[in-house]
From Swiss-Prot:
It comes from the Bacteria. One of its GO terms (biological process) is lipopolysaccharide biosynthetic process. It catalyses: 3-deoxy-alpha-D-manno-oct-2-ulosonate + CTP = CMP-3-deoxy-beta-D-manno-octulosonate + diphosphate. Its main location: cytoplasm. Gene3D superfamilies: Spore Coat Polysaccharide Biosynthesis Protein SpsA, Chain A (3.90.550.10). GO terms for cellular component: cytosol. Belongs to the KdsB family. It is found in: Cytoplasm. It comes from Methylobacterium nodulans (strain LMG 21967 / CNCM I-2342 / ORS 2060). Pathway: Nucleotide-sugar biosynthesis; CMP-3-deoxy-D-manno-octulosonate biosynthesis; CMP-3-deoxy-D-manno-octulosonate from 3-deoxy-D-manno-octulosonate and CTP: step 1/1; Bacterial outer membrane biogenesis; lipopolysaccharide biosynthesis. Its EC number is 2.7.7.38. This is 3-deoxy-manno-octulosonate cytidylyltransferase.
Length: 247
């Protein structure tokens, strides 16, 4: 594994929080906070890929790199694949990290941890999860559960992803965190595949990879980062960032 590239997909079309990437958090757009966290991970170059010139301008204003992609991509993974072809047509980067643009408080350490399973050449895609500690999350469909076979105390081989409460019986349940590190060839194969049966049923894109026989391993981390999807989430993110600046 060498020379990872972090790509941050961002689009303005969110229905619950319009213009989400540009939402102000302590004086800077949210996408800039995510970009700064990605830089702090120290993995390699960081590029924002977006369908909005205003997002490109916001990132470039702080010295970051951003590329403009088509507005009609069906998923963030497709946006990543287009951006990768623009940024690195020669194929210098063999690992691509997909960091969502709505995680302004994410710990850079877990971004770096996400690539570690790719040291095993049998792994196609790496991701993150955390043990569920709140009872209400066990049955909440918006909390995606990772069902996996333990490899070490902090690493699982993913067998399934579901919105249901799974697996049955005694033992931990894992909250999947939607940050992915792809081998380049795995990303290129993934976006070439049609949506799968289970992907359409669960509305979980990562099932396409599992159904195609690709291997996904997950690193177990301590906490689930705050994702900003609603005005309430945005207020929480502002409070977290304001508290950090006071310390």
């Amino acid at each position: 594994m060498s020379d990872p590239l972090i790509l941050i997909p961002a689009r303005l079309g969110a229905t619950r929080l319009p213009d989400k990437p540009l939402a102000d958090i302590c004086g800077e757009p949210m996408i800039v906070h995510v970009w700064r966290r990605a830089i702090a991970a120290g993995l390699g170059p960081v590029v924002v890929c977006t369908d909005a010139p205003t997002v490109v301008a916001a990132v470039e204003a702080v010295g970051g790199l951003a590329v403009l992609t088509r507005p009609d991509h069906p998923s963030g993974s497709d946006r990543l694949a287009e951006a990768l072809g623009i940024i690195d047509p020669e194929g210098r980067h063999d690992v691509v990290v997909n960091l969502q643009g709505d995680l302004p408080t994410i710990d850079p350490g877990i971004v770096a941890a996400a690539v570690t399973p790719l040291a095993d050449r049998a792994v196609d895609i790496a991701t993150l999860c955390a043990v569920i500690t709140r009872d209400e999350e066990r049955t909440e469909p918006s909390v995606v559960k990772l069902v996996g076979s333990p490899i070490t105390p902090t690493r699982l081989r993913a067998l399934y992803f579901t919105r249901a409460t799974a697996p049955w019986g005694e033992g931990p349940l894992y909250h999947h965190i939607g940050l992915y590190a792809y081998r380049r060839r795995a990303l290129e194969r993934f976006v070439s595949l049609s949506p799968s049966v289970l992907e359409r049923r669960e509305k979980l894109e990562q099932l396409r990879a599992l159904e195609a026989g690709m291997r996904i391993d997950a690193v177990v981390v301590d906490d689930v980062p705050l994702g900003v999807d609603t005005p309430h989430d945005l207020d929480r993110a502002r409070a977290v960032m304001a508290a950090r600046r006071l310390n």
